[in-house]
A protein has these predicted regions:
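Short, charged/polar N-terminal "headpieces" of proteins
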Residues: 1-25
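Residue-level marker of positions within ordered structural domains that often coincide
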Residues: 17, 39, 84
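Acidic, aromatic-enriched beta-alpha/helix-loop junctions
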Residues: 22-60
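Charge-rich, low-complexity amphipathic helices
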Residues: 27, 52, 56-64, 94-105, ...
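Helix-rich interaction surfaces within compact, conserved domain-sized segments
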Residues: 46-90
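C-terminal charged interaction modules
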Residues: 73-117
Length: 117
C-alpha cells in the first residue's frame, strides 16, 4: 500500500523527511547544517521568541511508494544535494525565505556555529 512522504520545513529550509504507511513510519533528520541554517535565518528575521519561531514551520506532503525507508532516504539525499552550503547561506541571508530580501546579520549570529558540512 502506498505511503505518504512529508517534508518538514522552517520557512523554505527543509529539516526532516518522514514517510508513513498504515503500519510503519520512517524518518530522517537532515544534516545538522540545516538546523544551524534555520537558527541563523530565524535570528536574521528577528524570530527569536518561541511563538514567532514555531509559527514558521510547515509541512509538504505527497504520495510515495511502498518502500518508505527507501523513499525517505532518497528524498533526504535529494534535499541534502539541492541545499548545498551556498544555497543555505542565501537562505540565511534572506531570513529563510527563498528569493526574499537580505537581512543584516544579527549580533549573536556572528558568534554562532559555522555552517560546516
Amino acid at each position: 500500500m502506498p505511503g505518504t512522504l512529508t517534508v518538514i520545513w522552517w520557512r523554505d529550509i527543509p529539516a526532516q523527511v518522514i514517510a508513513k504507511d498504515k503500519r510503519r513510519a520512517s524518518k530522517v533528520v537532515l544534516h545538522p547544517r540545516f538546523q544551524v541554517a534555520i537558527d541563523k535565518a530565524a535570528s536574521r528575521a528577528g524570530k527569536r521568541a518561541y511563538n514567532d519561531y514555531i509559527g514558521e514551520w510547515r509541512r509538504t506532503q505527497r504520495r510515495c511508494g511502498d518502500d518508505i525507508d527507501e523513499e525517505v532516504a532518497a528524498e533526504a539525499e535529494r534535499l541534502e544535494g539541492d541545499y548545498d552550503k551556498h544555497r543555505l547561506a542565501m537562505l540565511i541571508q534572506s531570513g529563510g525565505v527563498d528569493g526574499g530580501p537580505v537581512f543584516a546579520p544579527a549580533h549573536d549570529e556572528t558568534q554562532g556555529k559555522a555552517l560546516d558540512a
